[in-house]
Amino acid sequence: MLCWAAKWTDKRGIFSRSKGDEDFLTCLHALLNEADAVVHFNGCKFDMPWIHSEFLQAGLLPPSPYKQIDLLRTVRSQFKFPSNKLDYVSQALGIGHKTKGMSMDDWKGCMGNDEKSWKKMLSYNKRDVALTEKVYFKLLPWIKNHPNSNLYEDKVIDKMRCPTCGSEHFIARGNIATASGVYKRYSCNECHHWFRGHEQIAKINVKNKTSNV
């Protein structure tokens, strides 16, 4: 792993470090230790295993548990694009495109500690992070099993809020039936996610049945 970049979704700045930095791994470890959830694109199979391998070899313990939101999994399960690559998806959604790819000479330059090559590498990395965040917000209404943001609040929540983005602005739109009962269904005005209320408005009674085989 030559470098990494990351940002918080509610802040502007992008963190980045390269292999030669003294806190190359400890800074990343601290960020993951603080994170409730990590958004990435194919990170479950690629980025995170590489990062964990670096941590292990450096003698670092696992950071505190965090949820993973892999946008590639959402793209594959919910849509059918000609290509599932971040560059294609971001352009298809009108967000923008990745920085022009790194050439073999650029990679060799980084290995040889060439300043110009490193600058290009970090710029490429930061652009990927910026695109990933924008794609995340575009895909947000479609993401299944998104972590409940209300569970990570420091204060007590005394109002019903959207479990995905925490907004208090939503509207009731019909009911939803589950195996245990019927609940009010809501649509968030901010992230446009669907969710259900906590209280049952009707209970389903299931009778015991027997059958002969």
For the regions a language model picked out, list residue spans one by one.
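Acidic, Mg2+-coordinating catalytic module of metal-dependent nucleases/exonucleases
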Residues: 39, 88-155
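Residues immediately within or flanking Cys/His clusters that coordinate Zn2+
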Residues: 157-160, 185
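Short cysteine-rich clusters marking metal-coordination/redox-active sites
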Residues: 162-165, 188-191
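Short linker/helix segments within small regulatory modules
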Residues: 175-185
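Conserved DEDDh/DEDDy metal-dependent 3′-5′ exonuclease domain
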Residues: 10-92
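RNase H-like nuclease fold core
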Residues: 1-12
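Short, non-ligating residues that shape and space the ligands of small metal-coordination modules
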Residues: 168-174, 197-198
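Short metal-binding segments enriched for Cys and/or His
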Residues: 189-213
